[in-house]
A protein has these predicted regions:
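Histidine-rich, glycine-flanked metal-binding segment
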Residues: 2-8, 14-60
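Short secondary-structure transition/capping segments
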Residues: 49, 100-105, 211-214
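Active-site environment of divalent metal-dependent phosphoester hydrolases
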Residues: 69-71, 96-99, 203-210
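Divalent metal-coordination and catalytic microenvironments
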Residues: 13, 28, 33, 54, ...
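Divalent-metal coordination cores built from histidine and acidic residues
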Residues: 74-185, 189-199
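Active-site core of metal-dependent hydrolases
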Residues: 194-228
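Active-site beta-loop-alpha junctions enriched in small/polar residues
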Residues: 67, 156-158, 204
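Di-metal (Zn2+ and/or Mg2+/Mn2+) metal-binding site signature of metallo-dependent hydrolases
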Residues: 56-80
Length: 228
C-alpha cells in the first residue's frame, strides 16, 4: 500500500489472531477502525504508530457472565473487565436485571441486586437514569449512554415473571395461566426483537444442594421457583 494508507500500525507485538494459529511476532495495521493487514509493515505507512514491544496483540475478549446492567451507566469501561482486554460483555445473566421494571418495582430491583451481586445501593440509586420501563426502553437508554465496551444484553426472566405474575406469585412458583403465558412469550419476543441476545434464568431451588443465593429478604429468587 502507498504511504500513509494506514491510520494506525501496532509494531512488534506478539500476535494471537484468534484462529488457533501459533503466536507470532509482527505488526497490525488498522484503517477506518478495522484490521486491514498483519505481518511486517513499514511504520512510515501509518499516521500513528504504537510500539507493542514486549506486549501481546489479540482480538478483544468476550466476558459472557457479568452483571454490569447498572454499572455501565456510570462506568463506561465496565471495570474491571475493561482493564483486561475485554471489549464485549454480556449482561442480564442469571435471570437478574432491571427491565422490564415498573416504577414501583425499582426499589425492589436495586435491593435485590445489592444482595445477590453486591452492587452498592447508593451507586445504583444515583447512577442509573431509570428512564425506562420496558426492555426495549432499557436498551434505548443504553444506546444513549457513552460506552467504551460492547454490550450483549440477555433478557432476564426474573423481571418478566415479576411483571406478569406479581412478585409474591412469582416467588411462590405459581403456574402462569394461558393468558399470562402468552403475555410472557410476547414480552420475550418483543425484547429479543429489540436487541436481546438471548434470555437467562437462575435455577437454584431452595430445597436443592445449590440453594445458596437468596433475594434481599432471604426468600428465593423468582426464577428459582418458576415452573419448567
Amino acid at each position: 500500500m502507498a504511504s500513509q494508507d494506514y491510520d494506525v500500525v501496532i509494531k512488534d507485538g506478539l500476535i494471537f489472531d484468534g484462529t488457533g494459529s501459533p503466536r507470532r511476532r509482527g505488526d497490525v495495521a488498522i484503517s477506518d477502525g478495522k484490521i486491514v493487514a498483519m505481518g511486517r509493515i513499514d511504520a512510515s505507512s501509518a499516521t500513528s504508530v504504537i510500539d507493542a514491544s514486549g506486549m501481546h496483540i489479540a482480538p478483544g475478549f468476550v466476558d459472557l457472565h457479568t452483571h454490569y446492567d447498572a454499572q455501565v451507566f456510570w462506568d463506561p469501561y465496565c471495570t474491571l473487565s475493561g482493564w483486561h482486554g475485554i471489549t464485549s460483555v454480556a449482561i442480564g445473566n442469571c435471570g437478574f436485571g432491571f427491565a422490564p421494571v415498573a416504577e414501583d418495582m425499582r426499589e425492589y430491583a436495586m435491593k435485590s441486586m445489592t444482595r445477590v451481586e453486591a452492587i452498592p445501593y447508593e451507586s445504583m440509586k444515583q447512577g442509573m437514569p431509570w428512564d425506562w420501563v420496558t426492555f426495549s426502553e432499557y436498551l434505548d437508554s443504553l444506546d444513549r449512554t457513552p460506552k467504551a465496551i460492547n454490550i450483549l444484553p440477555y433478557v432476564p426472566a426474573g423481571p418478566m415473571l415479576t411483571e406478569v405474575l406479581g412478585l409474591a406469585d412469582a416467588k411462590a412458583g405459581r403456574m402462569p395461566t394461558n393468558d399470562e403465558h402468552a403475555r410472557l412469550a410476547q414480552m420475550l419476543n418483543e425484547s429479543m426483537d429489540a436487541g436481546g441476545c438471548g434470555w437467562s434464568a437462575q435455577r437454584l431451588p431452595p430445597t436443592g444442594p445449590a440453594a445458596v443465593q437468596r433475594d434481599w429478604d432471604g426468600t428465593p429468587m423468582p426464577t428459582d421457583m418458576m415452573n419448567d
